[in-house]
Amino acid sequence: MANKLHPIKSIEARTQSYVLDHFEKSKYAKRLRKLKDTHLGEMCFIIGNGPSLSTDDLEVLHKNNVLSFGFNRIFLMFDKTNWRPDFYVSQDKKMLCDCQDNVNKLNIKAKFISIINKYYYNIDIKDALYFNVHSSIQGVPIFSDSIDLYIGKSSTVAFSAAQIAVYMGLKKNISFRCRS
């Protein structure tokens, strides 16, 4: 007897496949489109989690109310600083599996999470803005200026944050304490 896919699971799988293939028509893309040029001409910092990241640097950003992106386990710094990123980005399956509760508790403007993590790994982040990813072409990462279609995947989530920042109209993006 052949293994049969449960009818509900089959429908879910086909729906997910359709959304990934036609992301621009999805409710997720519609939510992302609302962000287009919302911070036109403003500056932001893309904060890496490198070992040289200091709380003093973050406090300066906090005191000057500078827009910023943080990612992955940046919340581990929160007990040492008043700074919080305005935007959070993650596409790391293992980190999200391990830290889903922490990410759900983040009280920030927006959390950007790869839709793959929701669909394939059942990682459901409260109030997340889900994005689709496309891999590189012949090893060269694709930079997308239309995140409602896809974000070009790279070895670093900072690359994803930069694409989101550009889409939102943030013209001066400063990467800070990022490692590749």
Residue ranges of predicted features:
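Short amphipathic alpha-helical segments, especially helix-boundary/capping motifs
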Residues: 8-9, 49-52, 135-140
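Short acidic/polar alpha-helix capping motifs at helix-coil junctions
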Residues: 17-25, 38-42, 126-129
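Intrinsically disordered, low-complexity segments enriched in small residues
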Residues: 25-68, 77-80, 84, 89-90, ...
